[in-house]
Amino acid sequence: CGLCHSVQGTELKMIEGGFPNADVKKGESLEFYHSVCPVFYYKDEKKHDIWGNIKKALIGYSSDKKIRFKAASGGALTEISCYLLENKKVDAIIHTTYDPNDPTKTISCISTTVEEVISRCGSRYGISVPLKDILQMVQSNKKYAFVGKPCDVMALRRYLNKDEKLTKSIIYLLYYLFDLFSSVFR
């Protein structure tokens, strides 16, 4: 997710398969990683035989057909993001989009309008590290919603317990289940 890079400056090195991995130096304290990284705390969650580690799962989709068919997995998170902006619950949405310099890559972005959210929505079939620059993206006088993968949200939620200032800025955490049921909503 890149949170260790944003908070601690940990270098992210590409490993086999093209995935970024924290390059933890020999002798470096693992306290931060153990307290925030999903790799270390998944074991504490209840595990369902089919779904894995869950607390609650809901199914839904956007009532706006334009969003439902353009966005990923029925557009529920895009619709919620638009609602949060339209109703001034947040100033911006932190999420991912394709890299305009290389559409095969994913980058983090901040959307402040419904139009931006909709233009940047859709499935990303590539690696993303949406928390890599989270501290640099957030302005303390603004309110945000963050949209990411379940592991990104888990890491960010645990970090927010340590950072009161960031907790006041990122007030909604939203995640999705990897296009699991998109054909049901079409």
Where are these regions (language model features)?
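Iron-sulfur-associated redox domains of electron-transfer enzymes in respiratory
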Residues: 38-186
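Iron-sulfur cluster-binding cysteine motifs and their immediate structural context
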Residues: 3-23, 30-50
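Short, flexible, glycine/charge-rich loop motifs used to bind or transfer phosphoryl groups or to couple energy/partner
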Residues: 24-27, 134
